[in-house]
Structure formats: C-alpha cells, structure tokens
Amino acid sequence: FFLSALGSYYPEFLFFSKGDTSFALILAFNFYRIIGGIGVGLASAVCPMYIAEIAPSEIRGKLVSCNQFAIIFGMLVVYFVNYMIKDGMPDEVLVSDGWRYMFGSEAVPAALFGILLFLVPETPRYLAMTHQDDKAFSVLEKVNGTDKAKTILSEIKAVTSEKTEKLLTYGLTVIVVGILLSVFQQAIGINAVLYYAPRIFEKIGGGGDGMMQTVVMGVVNILFTLVAIFTVEKMGRKPLLIVGSIGMAVGAFCVAFCDEFQVGGILPVLSIIVYAAFFMMSWGPICWVLIAEIFPNTIRGKAVAIAVAFQWIFNYLVSSTFPAMYEFSPVFAYGLYGVICVLAALFVWKMVPETKGKTLEDMTRLWEKRAKEA
C-alpha cells in the first residue's frame, strides 16, 4: 500500500523529469495506480471478513460497521485535504501540482496500516481450520474470556472438518445472495454521487461552493454511519437495509423531481444529502456486515472474494456510466437509482437472512439445512 501510494504520487521521480507527459510516464502512472487498486481490493475484502471472524457475536455487527466508519472518516479527511489544496494554491500551480499532493497524502495512512498489521493476530476460525487449536484458543481467550473461548472453539470444530470446501457445497443460493448484496450496494448509485459530488453541487446550486458542500456531506456521512453502528445490534441487519433503501429511493426521486420542475436552491442539495445519509446508515456498513457474516466458514474466503469482485465491477460500471447519464438527463439518472433502491428493498425482504445475534457457525448450519432442503 505504501509503495503504491508513493508511486502514484510521483512516478516520474523514479523514471522521468518533472513535466514529462510521455506515453511511458502514463504507463508508469497507471501501473502504480493498478498496484494501489489491488491493495485496496484486497483490504476491502479481508478487513470486514477478519473483523467478523474475530469479534464476539453480540458486537460483531457494530465492529464490522466501524470498518465502514473508518472508510467514511478517511473520505472526509480527503475532502478536507483536497479543499485545503484547492483553496491554498494559485490556479496555475493547482493544475500542474495539486494532484501530486493529493496522491502523496495516501502514503502516510498506507504506511501506518502496513506497520500496524504486524500487531494483529490470525483469526481463531482460520487457526482452528488449519488444526492450530492452541493458537485459536489463545486468541479466543483474549477476546472472549476462558470459559466462552472453550465453547466457541468447540462450536467451530463441530461444524468445520476441513480448511476449505467446494464453493457450492452449501448450494448456489448463498453465493447469489452475497453477490446481489454487493451488486445492489453499488447499483443504487452512491459512489457515482460521491465521486462527482463537487461538480453536481456546483451545477445544481444551493448558494455555496461545491467543494465545501461536499465537505458538509462528508460530515453527514460520518454522523449517519454512527447511527448504523449504534443501531445494528438493536434493529438487526434486514430492517436497516430496508429502511435505508426506502429512504434512498425518496432522496433520489426528490432530486429527479427538482430537476424535472427546475427547483433550485437548497432542496436538491438536501435531497442528495438525504440520499447519502440513508445509504450511510444502511447499505454502506450493513452490506459489509452481511457479506462478512452470511457465508459458512469453509467457503467464506472464496465467497467473500467473489462478492467483493462483483462490488468493484459494478462500482466501475456505475461510476463510468453516471456522467453520461447525468449529462443526458439527471431525471433519468436519479429516477433509475430510485427504482433500483426499491428493488433492493424487495430483495432484502425476500432473500436475505437475518444474522443478528447468530454466531458464524449458526450461519453454517442454516445454509447446510437449506442446501439439504433444496
């Protein structure tokens, strides 16, 4: 992560002189961005899975949601960093050098992340599946206490005889549910809105600077992610996703309405903030919670990787198609996202199992039972 961030910041330091716009420089720049993308992809899959495997079941959802909070907090920091760079540089310097400072800032958290990983233990479920029971018990004891650690280790061993099993051992449904959770999280359009938030705010107005309004939205995102953290273990995963989907649909349809009837000022800005806020209290953190929880132990690694791969594929599709859709018709773009939000609510209601209060071994038994009944 550190090398990819540093390389993205200034690849021409390694190969070229400043200002060189050669094809080779473009290749070098994109090479380092790809390395960074691989790092982000790995982290996005492994982090929630790791938290779910090591956390006590009664606070697992809250802790996995904290992962999303950290991401949103990082995005808010980026908003502030970019705003300060934009505000503190002359335009001619901003165009040539502003992006270098933005990419360079990645190196600091990336280096800290890499260093701190040396202090993190392996998950007890992985250790148990690889027959390292003493190490698994040691980790469980530190997290849960001695008596509970014995019970949890016994449950893990009871449902796990092998390190891995074939992907479809528990049927196709669990894989489809995981994939569709990822697809809907992206297809509802949130990342397109976040990527292009400054330009959207500048275009629709609202009486202020587009970048500053983006910072305000970042603060809202953090506050509503906290709502998810403090309600996920009380309300459950499914109710939050359904409420969030409906709230997002309302926000998206309101933006479409404002554009269709030329309603300017603060209302369209508030509608986008409502749309983002409901995402942050639902699909933002809770999708990751469910992806980390629903899969049986022995296929979790492969299944999470597939689900996250679909997430990044649809992230790319949505973010790359949004500018053209928005230019063609904002009404169409936000209307489409609103419809997808409604479909997402129906999908969660009909197909997604509730994982609140269940151990990961309970989910293994659930899918094992469903596979036998199918």
Task: Label every model-predicted segment.
Residues F1-K135, V139-E141, A158-A374:
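Alpha-helical transmembrane bundle of multi-pass membrane proteins
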Residues V143-G145:
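Short helix/loop segments within enzyme catalytic domains
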Residues A149-A158:
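Short, well-structured alpha-helical segments
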